[in-house]
Amino acid sequence: MTDRLLNGPPVVSPQEWETACQQLLVKEKASTRARDALAAERRRMPWMRVEKSYTFDCPKGKVSLLDLFEGRRQLVIYRAFFEPGVFGWPEHACRGCSMMADQVAHVSHLHARDTTFANVSRAPQPDIERLKARMGWTMPWYTITDGFDADFGVDEWHGTNVFFRDGDNVCRTYFLNSRGDEALGSTWSYLDITPLGRQETWEDSPEGYPQSEPYKWWNWHDSYGVEQDGKWSDVVDAAQAIPA
């Protein structure tokens, strides 16, 4: 009895394995550069003004789409299917949507880049709060009360919409669904689909977009907003001085 894959790849020496890794790394770096270029193109997409008003339920009552930003400029909304008719209701949300919820990065890192994340569903708030408590989810999760899902392409299938707020004006800036959602979950993946991106100096962004040095804005998720002593910046500088 063996655990080896039937007709699997050959088992080679450490030297041969390293050579194969380096050969693949060339293609992986090309893929990363292509992904960065695509994100830069995404940041230059035209926007669509949101003309209608939308209302959601939350634990504290009724809120508007503008309220969902929580004062930040960018908003990422994932449409999770949790409602009557969904497999698992009322104990569970859609299995795929639940996996997505399990993968969401700690939202404090997104907040540090002026970005809010939220889930929306058709389920009433008591059911959502009960589900969140049992599954250990902490992201904001609102109840759709009107035509928001139909208007933004998420009435019959999951999807992620991105919005930007300029004062009280809201624009839709990006949308993806189906397998496009597979890559989401990390802080970077969400920032890369926003109009401002990661807001780091290496990015190709339109002139005037906010940017700061990479790594230096990073923090523990419970320490954003706390005055820093500059030691982390020194660590970053020292690390970047080491030849790659």
Labelled PLM ranges:
Residues 122-125, 147:
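Short beta-alpha junction loops
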Residues 116-122:
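Short internal beta-strands
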